[in-house]
Design a protein with these regions (language model features):
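Acyl-group handling in specialized metabolite and lipid biosynthesis
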Residues: 202-215
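N-terminal Rossmann-like dinucleotide-binding module
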Residues: 1-42
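Donor/substrate-binding cores of folate-linked one-carbon enzymes
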Residues: 21-22, 32, 81, 85-200, ...
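Short beta->alpha connector loops
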Residues: 8-11, 63-66, 87-90
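Conserved beta-strand segments of alpha/beta enzyme cores
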Residues: 25, 56-58, 102
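A residue-level signal for conserved active-site and pocket-lining positions in enzyme catalytic cores
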Residues: 7, 29, 52, 82, ...
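N-terminal glycine-/serine-/threonine-rich beta1-alpha1-beta2 phosphate-ribose binding loop
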Residues: 36-78
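An anion-binding loop in the catalytic cleft
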Residues: 214-304
């Protein structure tokens, strides 16, 4: 079965590596054009391109599929299936119609929940106890195609979105291999999504970063976890701006006003929330490095 793979970031590279190691016939790889990276602004290859070149696979990097020449280039590869993982482009119908067995996608949520570009982050932000990945067919509507299979995993109580993504990449890669194997054997069934149950996971932005201490400790903790490693929750402590990298939930103090410092322990700085409290374990002052909270405040003592 001839497979064309489309993807860009690390999660996609993990999936591509998995199906190549399984001996699948990948006849072409599509990824985003090379982009300037870091201060040097040198063009950098995507993680998927790195894997493809290491396996001597042809790489295609169109800006879009508006040009007929670009569509014909894909058609010439004669794919039986197109497998898409975090490609970063919406495929037009004329592309979806090319592969005989269809275009499939690995989406990092349990659809129909969290359709959109930041599914695993929103699962953490929303305080979900479990999430997973869905193998699905692509259609014109975003993340609304028929489902093929899912794989579920619990979310750790202190797990960040970044840590969760690392695990979902492995789970998604295994699900992609399983799905392609089943497609080759003609064993795939389609299950329509219940759109009435759909929720959406829009892109994150920095307006979401400031912590509102009137929220519950659980909500603050979920915000810190869900916005890590980007864009990272923020707050001011005694006039200094901080990025907050890690928290845990701790018992509150009755009558304490939200945002009040309850104390500095051996493990972190405890702050009252609207309900309960959190202990900041790791933070980063503006212009500084990430540090354990006790280490920072040892060098920058709190005001009485």
């Amino acid at each position: 079965m001839r497979v064309v793979f489309m993807g860009t970031p690390d999660i996609a590279a993990t999936c591509l590596r998995q199906i190549l190691n399984a001996g699948m016939d990948v006849v072409g790889v599509y990824t985003q054009p090379d982009r300037p990276k870091n201060r040097g602004m040198k063009l950098a290859f995507s993680p998927v391109k790195e894997v493809a070149l290491a396996h001597n696979l042809p790489v295609y990097q169109p800006e879009n599929f508006r040009e007929e020449e670009t569509v014909q280039q894909l058609r010439a590869l004669q794919p039986d299936v197109v497998a898409v993982v975090a490609y970063g482009r919406i495929l037009p119908q004329k592309v979806l119609d090319i592969p005989q067995k269809g275009c499939i996608n690995i989406h990092a949520s349990l659809l129909p929940k969290y359709r959109g570009s930041a599914p695993y982050q929103w699962a953490v932000l929303s305080g979900e106890k479990e999430t997973g990945v869905t193998a699905m067919y692509l259609c014109r509507e975003m993340d609304a195609g028929d489902m093929i299979d899912t794989s579920t995993t619990p979310i750790g109580e202190n797990e960040t979105a970044g840590e969760l993504l690392d695990r979902l990449a492995v789970i998604g890669a295994e699900l992609l291999e399983k799905t392609l194997s089943r497609m080759e054997k003609g064993e795939v069934e389609r299950t329509p999504q219940d759109s009435s149950m759909a929720t959406y996971a829009p892109m994150l932005d920095k307006s979401m970063c400031p912590i509102d201490w009137t929220k519950t400790a659980q909500q603050v903790h979920d915000q810190v976890r869900g916005l890590h490693p980007w864009p990272v929750a923020t707050t001011h402590i005694q006039g200094t701006f901080f990025k907050i990298h890690a928290t845990v939930i701790v018992p509150g103090k009755e009558g304490a006003q939200p945002g009040t410092i309850l104390g500095l322990t051996k493990t972190g700085l405890q702050i009252a929330c609207g309900e309960g409290a959190v202990e900041i374990r790791s933070l980063q002052a503006e212009g500084g490095k990430r540090m354990a909270a006790p280490d920072y405040f040892r060098g920058h003592p709190l005001e009485a």
